[in-house]
């Protein structure tokens, strides 16, 4: 089963232009959905993504990508 990433294009702490390419680099075959994830509170302060329906957040995008890499199915 392929991995799935869901990210918000409206949250202040998430830079979609840099995050999407890095997620695709982590798993080129993953399904990616972009849109509101109703995660506005944490999304205001931390970079976040849903990975296989699990929310992951971190103070920086670099830290988030490290968490994502640990959670994706190989």
From Swiss-Prot:
Q: Give the InterPro entries listed for this entry.
A: DUF1450, UPF0741
Query: Which top-level group of life is the source organism from?
Result: Bacteria
| A UniProt-annotated Pfam family | DUF1450
Bilayer-crossing regions: none
- Disulfide links within the chain: none
Query: What does the similarity note say?
Result: Belongs to the UPF0741 family.
Which HAMAP family does this one have? UPF0741
Name assigned to this protein = UPF0741 protein RBAM_034720
Q: Which organism is it from?
A: Bacillus velezensis (strain DSM 23117 / BGSC 10A6 / LMG 26770 / FZB42) (Bacillus amyloliquefaciens subsp. plantarum)
Query: Taxonomically, what lineage is the organism?
Result: Bacteria, Bacillati, Bacillota, Bacilli, Bacillales
């Amino acid at each position: 089963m392929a991995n799935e990433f869901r990210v918000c294009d409206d949250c202040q702490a998430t830079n979609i232009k840099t995050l999407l390419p890095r997620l695709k680099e982590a798993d080129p075959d993953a399904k990616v959905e972009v849109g509101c994830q109703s995660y506005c509170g944490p999304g205001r302060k931390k970079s976040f993504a849903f990975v296989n329906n699990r929310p992951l957040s971190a103070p920086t995008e670099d830290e988030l990508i490290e968490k994502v890499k640990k959670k994706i199915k190989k």
